[in-house]
């Protein structure tokens, strides 16, 4: 079983092991940073804190020149925090971003991280493009074209239909994960603005599975994608080894585990992003001492032709 081909050279493997040994074991059972970092985590009390402060952070890999956990293949990609390249987001004001998934790799959607600060403001997506924004850190204000305002805290989200005038503003540090897609129109069906939070969405039945599932968007045919929130307790795993036509974009919000993509098996942790092409075999198992939660994009309600 091949996990990381880049670890095949003994000197690099030994050096990486020394990095792991040199840091403290965290409360969730994964090698992590010195105790000062844990003190910060304990004091933060913030949901999804490890998305922006991952256990195995870029600073832990600074003594490994050229090393990254990121992988790009024909039918999947694992994009890890140490390989993010931040730059000003087009059309956004005072906002840095990192595009994690784009059509350049074969997807029909984009997924990016937006890092906002004081006086940051979103731009509008291109014509006929819909947007979904989820807050993983901080707080933002969504203002609609009619002037209605919605305060979005961590774990809150907004779906903006295509050509829907709006702005997302921040008065302080905030991090969003954003999905955008050119909308696939259906006659006599039109999606509407959706604003909500994860915990207010009902748990759904998952026949044959043991994970918990919430869908953040309506399941009606007006919506051509949905966003799933999936929770696994340590030791739980997908029963179905999925192979399907749908594409996925995934952000691990909490926890750690092993993700199978094709014939590769990847250790993953909060902050990691994954792209899954149509028909790539996929499977997940949660490890550690705390739950796994991930956010998952999935195209739905459209004939693949």
Question: Language model features by range: what are they?
Answer:
Residues 27-108, 173-225:
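A short, N-terminal "cap"/entry segment at the start of jelly-roll beta-barrel domains
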Residues 139-145, 150, 168-169, 233-235, ...:
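Long compositionally biased, domain-poor regions of proteins
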